[in-house]
Amino acid sequence: LLANKKVAEFIGKQKKTFVYRIHDEPNEDKLINLQTVISKFGYAINMKSKQDISKSLNKLLNDVNGKKEQNLVDTLTIRSMSKAKYSTENIGHYGLAFDYYSHFTSPIRRYPDVMAHRLLQYYIDGGKSVDADTYEEKCAHSSDMEGLAAQAERDSVKYMQVKYMQDHKDQEFLGVISGVTEWGIYVEIIENKCEGMVRIREIKDDYYTFDDKQYALVGQVSKNIIQLG
């Protein structure tokens, strides 16, 4: 982190074109939606300032660790955050609370790091600021490719999970309820992290309705409660 920070700061203060790793503030509407959900579990977000939001989110993730609602809160918190990307326009890195940040330390596996190395050497040798538009195009392409790589990774994991479960159709697994909605529940198998949905109509022992205050399904006759965890 220190190397990434200092290289970006060294060039940034010279006002020369550089490849930054930037991270914008969380989306306000998504934060409000997150606040609505977590309030049902007794949590809150202080949205008075950027610093307060950052501290609140970190505290929230620490507080839910190991709790039955952790999976839901973790997912919603991540979704409320902006995605980090590459750009020549430095706005800082919100998640790390850095005014200057770059990806510099892994040129063996990331092209933006290669660009950062080349620009650093070029400027140390006395070079003038390079064309910002040219490098902004490279940054946009790098961000797009990063997104595709992340999606490919998620898809490959899902594919292998489906392939595994096809060979274990009649086997019983221990799972936890990772999500509750008005149309059903999500169950994650503890052993292998595979997740699937059980629709309300497939739960035959009662007629269940969604209780948004408890974030649970409640049986109309038995009053049985199906909730996170």
Question: What kind of feature is each model-predicted range?
Answer:
Residues 6, 24, 29, 39-229:
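Structured C-terminal cores of nucleic-acid metabolism proteins
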Residues 7-21:
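Glycine-rich phosphate/pyrophosphate-binding loops
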Residues 11, 36-38:
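Hydrophobic alpha-helix position signal
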Residues 31-33:
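Nucleic-acid-binding small beta-barrel platforms of the OB/S1 family
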